[in-house]
Amino acid sequence: GCALSPKDVRETTLEAMATASRVATFVGKGEISVSPEVAYIIQEKCDRCEICIKVCPVAAVEKSPEAITINPISCVGCGICVPRCPREAIDLKNSTEAQLMAQIRGVSEGGKPPKIIAFLEKEIAYGSADLAGQSRVSYPSNVRIIGVPSTGRVSLKHLLQAFAYGADGVVLLEDHGGVFKEETLREHVTQMKKELREYGVEPLRLMSFSTTLPEYGKVTETFETFNSRISKMGPLSEENRAKIREKLQSN
């Protein structure tokens, strides 16, 4: 309702009724369903630095005298906390770091250049790209999509994995109204562009934007524009890819 943003009476009433309905279901059954894809802390690695508490957008990370834990009911599984843990003490159930790294490598390998890896927030952003296909609006076939809970889940390590095994450009596409806000996304990408320079990767090989579900035209147009840019830049050199792979393996 109006606690979220200015709204008219009709919209406020509808949102209030929807909220009341969800609460009534919970109270009536005395139970609630929890997504299997929620974050958890690997306690033997955790040094209780509390960075996860600061970055969680829904305050799902809880501190007690014994340990730091993640409330599975509050957690929305966005994955923002995972790459920000300096000790790699956080992971996502059923969507682990190892699974994501393997998926990135598999999608990046093979095919003809230029290859573009697009990390899409898996609900709205992915749905928008899917809607483009249903509407018979095409985008370049060399754009390969990987669904993620939010683009905040994607770190420099994931970008390097993509570039090391065949990607020539990377796109991050976020839900405009999601938990990973547009301003935070811009800051995140700006920082990663600076870090990519240190690995010999031009910052222009990375771009980001946000979308809403109906804006599939914007999604396809941006893919086209980015594809043209990467085509002009040409593929990343094999020598550079080899150096990145070596650094990844040494970490």
Cite the ranges covered by each PLM segment:
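Residues within well-ordered alpha-helices
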Residues: 42, 52, 71, 158-159, ...
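Short glycine/threonine-rich loop-to-helix capping motif typified by GTGT followed
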Residues: 45-51, 217-220
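Iron-sulfur cluster-binding cysteine motifs and their immediate structural context
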Residues: 47, 51-76, 80-99
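Iron-sulfur-associated redox domains of electron-transfer enzymes in respiratory
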Residues: 1-16, 20-21, 96-251
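Short beta-alpha connecting loops at secondary-structure transitions
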Residues: 1-8, 36-39, 66-68
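Conserved NTP-handling cores and scaffolds of large molecular machines
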Residues: 20-27, 31, 89, 230
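Conserved short loop/turn motifs at secondary-structure junctions
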Residues: 41-43, 70-74, 177-180, 210-212
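Long, charged amphipathic helices and adjacent flexible linkers at domain junctions
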Residues: 25-45, 98-106, 244
